[in-house]
Amino acid sequence: MTLRLQRRRFRFALLQPLRTAAGELRERCGWLLRLENDQGAVGWGEVAPLQPQQFMACDQALASLPDELPQAQLEAVLREAPGPVGFGLGAALAELQGVVGPASPQGWLKAPAPALLLPAGEAMLSALEAAAASMGGLESCTFKLKVATAPDGLERQLLEQLLQRLPPSARLRLDANGGWDRSTAEAWMQRLRDDPRLDWLEQPLAVQDQIGLEQLAALGPVALDESLDQHPELRRSWSGWQVRRPALE
């Protein structure tokens, strides 16, 4: 069966820039994919890598694909292409074949409630107040906060104010994007390890400090993120939490 592949670039500005320890993200860009078979069935996919090096690899992979190709060739590409390209093509093929989407007998599964991402720094408190007003309270909500974006003393003060405002049923995830050193990460873990609202510290140390990550995980909950991208073998061996993004793997 021959499949026709169309690609369209997209780029849009985020409503609010995302500050992380690695810098500031102001826009998202990628490709919208459309697959069509000989019977007119259509499937859609998206390729939206986060890292610049991923974007270049995806650009090259998509540029190498012909506009028409046999399904067997496409399936071979899925196994060899960069993760975001494999996901986008796989999603389009799955919808075209009726595995997911309107043609599927099961339809789409309901998405779980996401964690609410709070802005980094002092803007976090006003965003928390706005969330409480819009949701009628903060009970049973999960919040994610980017840390290691400002001086540690300021962030520790903001943490205490945040903890004062969160009810006992709320959950908290702190994402350092590898921006802490060992002493800073340990200080945060010691402060939070006995707080039942803590889900985890996400990528508290740099990818290169795997020993430090393992030592910190012995003190409290640690989730790996960037480490899994650069060392995929950890997806099988890491016994703690893992932040997984199928769209990028």
Cite the ranges covered by each PLM segment.
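N-terminal capping/lid subdomain adjacent to the active-site entrance of alpha/beta enzymes
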Residues: 1-172, 177-179, 190-195
